[in-house]
């Protein structure tokens, strides 16, 4: 397969590579060496926040979004070249506001969010003012098959009543996390691939609880996951 360059690849890729080599890599080892307790590893790190400021100053922000109204207007093919470069380091994607779960959540809000939802959640995510989480995996079922989800949402007197537990929920432990996109069953009588919905749940909603931080990779993962009950 032949991988041809494009004008946008030629413009952005050298800038991304320079940012990584000149700014990110020199501080990465120092950040990784810091003995941060596992339950504190989602908290904002001052050196990473400095990287974000530099990335914005260099025009390297929200590069993942193909919609030019919000991002750089790159195709998936063009962005893949930048993502490959970002993959050299733990922190480059976060520094450029291109890290999961925020990227996928922003894409959902761009495609399907109402104007009100975009104003409330998408804009602050694009600005790096808040973080988000995505709730899919559940303790009791093989969650790689989304049709197994057991969490439910039922409309009662005009309000959604949501019951369920998610774990390995990336992002939920970050104190800046203000919204979770929560996958749940809303139409249990439908065909099994048409039973589910994604519901936006503000993290300060009564009944939402981050139960515990999940441990993985001998406690060395720089980004632990969480067990969330709704």
Q: Each predicted region: which residue ranges?
A:
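Amphipathic, small/basic residue-rich leader segments at the start of a protein or domain
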Residues: 1-99, 116-120, 124-127
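N-terminal glycine-rich flavin-associated loop
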Residues: 96-116, 145
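A short, Trp-centered hydrophobic/proline-enriched beta-strand micro-motif
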Residues: 129-136
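Active-site-adjacent elements of ketosynthase-type condensing enzymes
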Residues: 140-149
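A structural signal for short hydrophobic beta-strand segments in well-ordered beta-sheet cores
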Residues: 151-154
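Flexible, small-/acidic-enriched active-site or ligand-binding loops
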Residues: 206-221
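Single conserved hydrophobic/aromatic residue that forms the stacking wall/gate
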Residues: 219-230
